[in-house]
UniProtKB/Swiss-Prot annotation:
Cofactor dependency: Mg(2+); Mn(2+)
Annotated source species: Santalum album
Name of protein: Sesquiterpene synthase
Short sequence motif DDXXD motif: positions: 312-316
Cofactor descriptive note: Binds 3 Mg(2+) or Mn(2+) ions per subunit.
Keyword Lyase: yes
PANTHER family: ALPHA-HUMULENE_(-)-(E)-BETA-CARYOPHYLLENE SYNTHASE (PTHR31225:SF93), OS04G0344100 PROTEIN-RELATED (PTHR31225)
One Pfam family it belongs to: Terpene_synth
EC number: 4.2.3.-
SUPFAM superfamilies for this protein: Terpenoid cyclases/Protein prenyltransferases, Terpenoid synthases
Length: 559
């Protein structure tokens, strides 16, 4: 932490102020993504034709397996893992409904298949699609003492699929909790004795199960794994690689446009104390939705994301309490006339927020969805109020109880805010009823916020305390309960398990809102697991984050 004295003439009675500067690392990307070289139109058109031809071939293969559920499940699994399931949403929906009705509702189990892999795959794919199939289907793999049978010990493929399936568990499914421990322990003991590619697949799953992985990032990893299996579907693999490259071109174009916009604002110079993280922010947004139909939605959320990241740092790492009070009041008024009442350094940020929202408002008006702006503004106001509450705690050196801390910290996690903004560009599916549901703070939102807040606090609290940050949940919990830091981490890990079960429960049918809206919440939660699993990868951009960004936005797939 470094204290700097900065004159602020526009704040009454303040001549020199001592500020705790966080010294965030600068952006590592520079202008790398500003320039975008468009692909030759003829080559682009040829690739698009190939994609359409391959899509038709895959559709025919799906249709041909209608009476072969295991083959159909394997094709569906591959399309999802390769990141191309969005092309076949209707076909996959119909196939899974057919499988559910004919193998579960009519028979109450997955008849005709007694191996662990097949049953676990069936269970996982149906659960992923919202069907609450019973975990009793795994009873056949347990002995009379309710332990999983010793005969499963060497079935690495089946154990891996069981391990993946257990991450779809909900509350009260102790069998799946036991199955997770059993599969995880056994896989850890045999992984070094397995051959490639299964060994690599097991290692990856033990680090990050499918349920917590970002679909686009998981696809990049799965390309080489899938290709290494002799049984891979060549049409699927080629389609996935071509589609990946076409989408990557679109994403690079979007990022190039955003990079020019961001540079024109010159926030890096105007707010040198704040994190300059446009590229990392765009990676975050790609985690929420990568599909081409959400291009407008991405452009909206990345602009707002960069604004709120700067505001967060103004509250956390620069502003005085008096200045922050002025900014908070200006946000509540939401009026360009409030500019005159702000310190000079705050004005560009406040003005840019209003400009971005005006731009979004014009787009919403064109779509006949102006009602969405009420929610977008209200959620911003509430977020800033939360930042102000934390700033007061920090100023007073107050350490709240964990129960007092969490309601504010869930707001400042920003995840209700980001979910709201993520809905703005999603078209008619984001109805007024959907926004009202979101603002009722349903369990799935609280769970998503909890994952964000708990993982953020676990990974960033030491750096934050070194620079004079508000007490994190770790400090609050340690002080209130008189426990060690490791004991606090253990409790947070238990709460993370609970939160993921809440999310799984809320993603089961019947859906309270359309599934695409729930997927934004699930994907936002997944982003946190990717960026904050071992460190705060957003603030301190190290190898893991660099590699993830490069894999999605720099390195094409070799077809």
């Amino acid at each position: 932490m470094e204290n700097q004295k900065v004159p602020i003439s526009s704040v009454p009675n303040l001549k020199e102020l001592s500020r705790p500067i966080a010294n965030f690392p600068p952006s590592i990307w520079g202008d790398r993504f500003i320039n975008y070289a468009c692909e030759d139109e003829n080559e682009q058109a040829q690739k698009e034709r190939q994609v359409e031809e391959l899509k038709e071939q895959v559709r025919r293969e799906l249709a041909a397996t209608v009476d072969k559920p295991l083959q159909q499940l394997n094709i569906i699994d591959a399309t999802q893992r390769l990141g191309i399931a969005y092309h076949f949403e209707n076909e996959i929906e119909e196939s899974l409904e057919h499988i559910y009705l004919h193998t579960y509702v009519e028979n109450n189990c997955f008849q005709g298949s007694h191996d662990l892999y097949s049953v676990a795959l069936w269970f996982r794919l149906l659960r992923q699609d919202g069907y609450k199939v019973s975990c009793d289907v795994f009873d056949k793999f347990r002995d009379y003492e309710d332990n999983f049978k010793n005969s499963l010990m060497e079935d690495a493929k089946g154990l891996l699929e069981l391990y993946e399936a257990t991450h779809l568990s909900v509350h009260g499914e102790e069998m799946l909790d036991d199955a997770l421990e059993f599969a995880k322990t056994r896989l850890e003991s045999i992984v070094n004795h397995l051959n490639y590619p299964l060994a690599e697949q097991v290692r990856h799953a033990l680090y990050r199960p499918l349920r917590k992985g970002l679909p686009r990032l998981e696809a990049v990893y799965f390309f080489r794994i899938y290709e290494a299996y002799d049984s891979h579907n060549k049409a699927l693999l080629k389609l996935a690689k071509l589609d990946f490259n076409l989408l990557q071109s679109l994403h690079k174009k979007e990022l190039s446009d955003m990079a020019r916009w961001w540079k024109s604002l010159d926030f890096a110079a105007k707010f040198p104390f704040a994190r300059d993280r446009l590229v990392e922010g765009y990676f975050w947004v790609l985690g929420v939705y990568f599909e081409p139909q959400y291009s407008l939605a991405r452009k909206i959320i990345i602009k707002v994301f960069t604004m709120i990241s700067t505001i967060d740092d103004i509250y956390d790492a620069y502003g005085t309490l008096d200045e922050l009070e002025l900014f908070t009041k200006a946000m509540q008024r939401w009026d360009v006339g409030s500019l005159d009442q702000l310190p000079e350094y705050m004005k560009p940020c406040y003005k840019s927020i209003l400009d971005v929202y005006n731009e979004i408002e014009e787009e919403m008006d064109n779509q006949g969805s102006l009602f969405r702006m009420h929610y977008a503004k209200e959620v911003m106001k509430k977020l800033v109020e939360g930042y102000m509450d934390e700033a007061k705690w920090c100023h007073e050196k107050y350490v709240p109880t964990f129960e007092e801390y969490m309601p504010v910290a869930l707001v400042t996690s920003g995840y209700t805010f980001l979910t709201t903004i993520s809905y703005l560009g999603m078209g008619e599916i984001a109805s007024k009823e959907a926004f009202d549901w979101l603002f009722s703070h349903p369990p799935v939102i609280e769970a998503s916020e909890s994952v964000c807040r708990l993982m953020d606090d676990m990974r960033s609290h030491k750096f934050e305390q070194e620079r004079g940050h508000v007490a994190s949940g770790i400090e609050c919990y340690m002080k209130q309960y008189g426990v060690t830091e490791e004991e606090a981490h253990d409790e947070f890990r238990k709460q993370l398990v609970k939160a993921w079960k809440d999310i799984n429960e809320e993603c089961l049918r019947p859906y309270r809102v359309p599934k695409p809206l729930l997927m934004r919440i699930l994907n936002l939660t997944r982003v946190i697991d990717v960026i904050y699993k071992n460190e705060d990868g957003y603030t301190h951009v190290k190898k893991a984050m660099k590699d993830n960004i490069a894999s999605l936005l720099i390195d094409p797939m070799i077809v």
